[in-house]
């Protein structure tokens, strides 16, 4: 059972996350020749104040 864990900054809507899950699942299924029903995708959303980019908080870099 392939499992993909993806960390993203908060702010995406459910439709965007659903698209991400579907497309990642399809890519994993295709590339590993695994049944689509066996693929798991975990999305972890991070607050922009809990992530750094180039030494600064993402909340300051990305608005």
From Swiss-Prot:
Entry's Gene Ontology molecular function annotations: isomerase activity
Keyword terms: Aromatic hydrocarbons catabolism, Isomerase, Plasmid
One GO biological process term: xylene catabolic process
Keyword match Isomerase: yes
Active site: 2 (proton acceptor)
Reactions catalysed: (2Z,4E)-2-hydroxyhexa-2,4-dienedioate = (3E)-2-oxohex-3-enedioate
Enzyme Commission number(s): 5.3.2.6
Superkingdom classification of source: Bacteria
Pathway where this protein functions: Xenobiotic degradation; toluene degradation; Xenobiotic degradation; xylene degradation
Enzyme class: isomerase
InterPro entries in UniProt: 4-OT, 4-OT-like_dom, Tautomerase/MIF_sf
Pfam families in the record: Tautomerase
CDD domains: 4Oxalocrotonate_Tautomerase (cd00491)
Family listed: Belongs to the 4-oxalocrotonate tautomerase family.
Function: Catalyzes the ketonization of 2-hydroxymuconate stereoselectively to yield 2-oxo-3-hexenedioate.
Subunit structure comment from the entry: Homohexamer.
Protein name stated in the entry: 2-hydroxymuconate tautomerase
Provenance organism: Pseudomonas putida (Arthrobacter siderocapsulatus)
